[in-house]
From Swiss-Prot:
Binding site for DNA: 308, 313
Name of protein: Holliday junction branch migration complex subunit RuvB
Keywords: ATP-binding, Cytoplasm, DNA damage, DNA recombination, DNA repair, DNA-binding, Hydrolase, Nucleotide-binding
GO biological process: DNA recombination; DNA repair
Native organism: Chlamydia trachomatis serovar A (strain ATCC VR-571B / DSM 19440 / HAR-13)
Length: 334
C-alpha cells in the first residue's frame, strides 16, 4: 500500500516535537518506567524534591527525554549542562545558585566532568550547600551558601567511569537498554503522526529493523525516508521506497552501516577473524577508539557479530555468514 506524505513547511523543531512529555508517551523500557513513576509519585505525594537520578546506557536511547519527563511530571524547571564543560567549581557555581526549588539539574555525559567540579558537587547533592571564595590572596575568605533543594539527573554512556563517591550519591539508578523492533514501530507510529507522515506498519517495521534499537536513529531515518520520497518518489511512501531510501545511506537489513561492515571486514579479511585490538581497528577504519567503543561495538556485540576477549575482538560465525565469508577460513580448514 502506498501513502502520500504531507510535507511540513517547518521542521526546525523536529527533535523537540517528537520528544515524549510524560511517561505514558515514552515507549519501551517498561521496568525502568515503572520504577521511575513510583519514585516520582512518592516524592510528589510527600511534597518532597525527588532524590538524585542516574541514567546510563548507549547513546540515543532516551536519557535526556527522561530528564524532560521528570521536570514535566513534577512541574518544575529543567536546567541542562554538559559534563565536558564542567571542569572546575567556577563552571558550576552560576548554575547551582541559579536553580529554583525543585528544579531538575541535568548533566549529560556526567562521566566527563572534571574531578574538581565533581567534588564540588558532593556537598551540593548531599546538603544543598556550596562554598565560594571571596577575594584573593591573604584576605581571601570562604562563604557557605545555601542552595534551593534540587534534583540532579546525570546521564552517561559509561557508568563504569564514574567514581564511587559520585555514583553512590544517586538515589535512583536506571539502565536504558536497546529497544525492540516492536517498541521502535510504536515510537515511529507516534512520530509519523506528529510529522503528518502516512505510513503503514510494514513501512515502519522496515525502518525499525535498521535503526539499531535506537529511537533517535529511528526518527532520523523516518525523516530521511520522508525526504527521499518527496524528492524521488512523488511524495509516495511504502516499504519498497523505505528500503531504497535506507539503501542509499548504506544501511543493510540488519542495521549495519558502512563503518560496521568495515570493522567486520578488517577483522575477517586481514586478521583471520581476530583477536584484534581496538586501536588497530580504529586505525584501519579511520575512527577513534572511543567512537568505536561507544557507537559501533555495543550493537555488533548485541547482534552476536563480535565477541570481546582478553586478547581483543573476535568476529563470530554470524559475522562470517552476514558478510558471505567462509568461517572455515578462520581456522585454515579445508
Amino acid at each position: 500500500m502506498t501513502h502520500k506524505i504531507s510535507v511540513l513547511h517547518q521542521d526546525k523543531k523536529f527533535d523537540f516535537s517528537l520528544r515524549p512529555k510524560k511517561l505514558t508517551e515514552f515507549c519501551g523500557q517498561k521496568q525502568l518506567k515503572e520504577r521511575l513513576d513510583l519514585f516520582l509519585r512518592a516524592a510528589v505525594q510527600r511534597n518532597e524534591v525527588p532524590g538524585h537520578c542516574l541514567f546510563y546506557g548507549p547513546p540515543g536511547l532516551g536519557k535526556t527525554s527522561l530528564a524532560h519527563i521528570m521536570a514535566n511530571t513534577i512541574g518544575k524547571g529543567l536546567v541542562i549542562a554538559s559534563g565536558p564543560q564542567l571542569l572546575k567549581p567556577s563552571d558550576l557555581i552560576g548554575l547551582l545558585t541559579g536553580l529554583q526549588e525543585g528544579d531538575i539539574f541535568f548533566i549529560d555525559e556526567i562521566h566527563r566532568m572534571g574531578k574538581a567540579a565533581e567534588e564540588y558537587l558532593y556537598p551540593a547533592m548531599e546538603d544543598f550547600k556550596v562554598d565560594i571564595t571571596l577575594d584573593s590572596g591573604p584576605g581571601a575568605r570562604s562563604v557557605r551558601l545555601d542552595l534551593a533543594p534540587f534534583t540532579l539527573v546525570g546521564a552517561t554512556t559509561r557508568a563504569g567511569m564514574l567514581s564511587e563517591p559520585l555514583r553512590t550519591r544517586f538515589a535512583f539508578t536506571g539502565r536504558v537498554d536497546y529497544y525492540t523492533d516492536e517498541d521502535l514501530v510504536s515510537i515511529l507510529s507516534r512520530s509519523s503522526q506528529l510529522l503528518s507522515i502516512e505510513a503503514n506498519q510494514e513501512t515502519l517495521l522496515e525502518i525499525a529493523r535498521r535503526a539499531r534499537g535506537t529511537p533517535r536513529l529511528a526518527n532520523n531515518l523516518l525523516r530521511w525516508v520522508r525526504d527521499f520520497a518527496q524528492m524521488r518518489e512523488g511524495n509516495c511512501i511504502n516499504s519498497a521506497v523505505a528500503e531504497k531510501a535506507l539503501a542509499m545511506l548504506l544501511i543493510d537489513n540488519l542495521g549495519l552501516n558502512e563503518i560496521d561492515i568495515k570493522l567486520l571486514s578488517v577483522m575477517i579479511d586481514f586478521y583471520q577473524g581476530g583477536p584484534v585490538g581496538m586501536k588497530t581497528l580504529a586505525m584501519a577504519v579511520g575512527e577513534d577508539v572511543r567512537t568505536l567503543e561507544d557507537m559501533y561495538e555495543p550493537f555488533l556485540i548485541l547482534k552476536g557479530l563480535v565477541q570481546r576477549t582478553a586478547r581483543g575482538r573476535v568476529a563470530t560465525p554470524l559475522a562470517y555468514e552476514h558478510l558471505n565469508r567462509n568461517p572455515k577460513d578462520r581456522w585454515g580448514e579445508e
